[in-house]
Swiss-Prot record:
The keyword Cell inner membrane applies. One of its GO terms (biological process) is protein repair. It is a multi-pass membrane protein. Binds 1 FMN per subunit. PANTHER family: PROTEIN-METHIONINE-SULFOXIDE REDUCTASE HEME-BINDING SUBUNIT MSRQ. NCBIfam families: PRK05419.1-4 (NF003832). Belongs to the MsrQ family. The lineage of its organism: Bacteria, Pseudomonadati, Pseudomonadota, Gammaproteobacteria, Enterobacterales. Its cofactor is FMN; heme b. This is Protein-methionine-sulfoxide reductase heme-binding subunit MsrQ. Part of the MsrPQ system that repairs oxidized periplasmic proteins containing methionine sulfoxide residues (Met-O), using respiratory chain electrons. Thus protects these proteins from oxidative-stress damage caused by reactive species of oxygen and chlorine generated by the host defense mechanisms. MsrPQ is essential for the maintenance of envelope integrity under bleach stress, rescuing a wide series of structurally unrelated periplasmic proteins from methionine oxidation. It is found in: Cell inner membrane.
Amino acid sequence: MRLSLRHITWLKIAIWLAATLPLLWLVLSINLGGLSADPAKDIQHFTGRMALKLLLATLLVSPLARYSKQPLLLRCRRLLGLWCFAWGTLHLLSYSILELGLSNIGLLGHELINRPYLTLGIISWLVLLALALTSTRWAQRKMGARWQKLHNWVYVVAILAPIHYLWSVKTLSPWPIIYAVMAALLLLLRYKLLLPRYKKFRQ
């Protein structure tokens, strides 16, 4: 079945629900005491995992659209990417405010230098910031070919973000490894899609 614009509208509504309902759940859990004895860590990990899930969903769009021959799916990619950035920003804020505290926010630079996993995290967020700021059609027209080069940096985030997660957890858990494997598979899939173009270019 060929997807129509109406289907894409419903998909975008589903994305909005999938991205906002977890935030509602988190707020309710905070207010109803549904978190652990270390709620700050719970919030940091929850927001970080949401950002990573949305990153993986964003990366999945292109190969899914190509293999299913549904080019309209690409219209969902920007929305997923913006929600990935939004949750990534919540993740950064949760660390800055809940872990360091507003009175010690100046220590953030020191923490970034002395904790390499934080360095990877802030690099990932800065790339997502650049991608979010240039996600409009206007920016795409103004930047021309440079726009695609910039947005290819999402694959750098796909490498750094799972490493950041693996490095940051203090207890043994399968989830960081699962996310890392999923990111690696998506990167491999993207490589296979780009390889024919590269060979054609070399010829």
